[in-house]
Amino acid sequence: MLFRSAPDWRDQLETAAKAGGASFYVSGIFPGFASDQLALLMTTQSKNIRCITASEVALNDHYPVADVMMDGMGFGRPLDFEPMLKTPGFIELAWKAPIYLMASGLGVEVEEVRGTLDRQLTDRDIKVAFGTIAAGTCGAVRTRAAGVVNGGEAIVIEHVIRMARDVAPDWPTSDCDATYRVDIEGDPDIHCVMTLGEAAGHGAGHAAMMSTAMRVVNAIPYVVDAAPGLLSSLDIPTTLPRHVFDGALTQILDPT
């Protein structure tokens, strides 16, 4: 995500976009809609806020890329292995964009971003899309990035990923393959839960990929209408889809 990116290359992109009359917008689901815009939408009900937490709890046994899952995140590795996630500053860098975006939308300044990483072992072998996670290696990962406002952790992004539902039972859980939550401590307290995929809670992997793509596809006409430059969801209207019922109507009229 580009929000509040390093000014040296952000300024270059901004200048190039304006010179060429182009607009550039990025989004997704998490990071993306569920990690920032959904939370901001929920705050329209708030009188005051102590803390906003946007979180994802996901079963990622379907993800097939071993390099990302093992070397990047540490799954299937012993706890003394240092994945990319453990690189100092990586979690803060990875999640600061939605934190700064929410802060900007609410008109507050982030003093710093604090990142933490936790991992838990599996006590059994787990068959997953990229191979086998052996007993005694990492079977669940939890990251947390907290934006500090007025000295307190006020805007928090949490991410819990498991390779099986029974790993790390003391962490936040979900009956669905992927659950996105927004929890706002304030007046009033607000809690919003969003799931993707079938109603039974399965198929979230495919649904998340579709949602990620459609966040961008549905934004196209709004980005075209926007002024040249680098855009965030704060710069364009809610990206309501167009012609969204056309395909469904065609199938109803001609199911063959």
Please identify what each model-predicted range represents.
Residues 10-29, 52-53:
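Rossmann-fold dehydrogenase core element
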Residues 33-45:
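Alpha-helical support elements that line or immediately flank enzyme active sites
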Residues 8, 32-33, 89-97, 140, ...:
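Conserved active-site and cofactor/substrate-binding residues in soluble primary-metabolism enzymes
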Residues 21-27, 86, 199-207:
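A short glycine/serine-rich beta->alpha loop
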Residues 5-6, 29-35, 59:
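Gly/Ser/Thr-rich loops at beta-strand to alpha-helix junctions
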Residues 43-170, 174, 178-182, 206:
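Active-site-lining helix/loop region of Rossmann-like oxidoreductase modules
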Residues 129-256:
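C-terminal active-site/capping subdomain that shapes the small-molecule cofactor and substrate pocket
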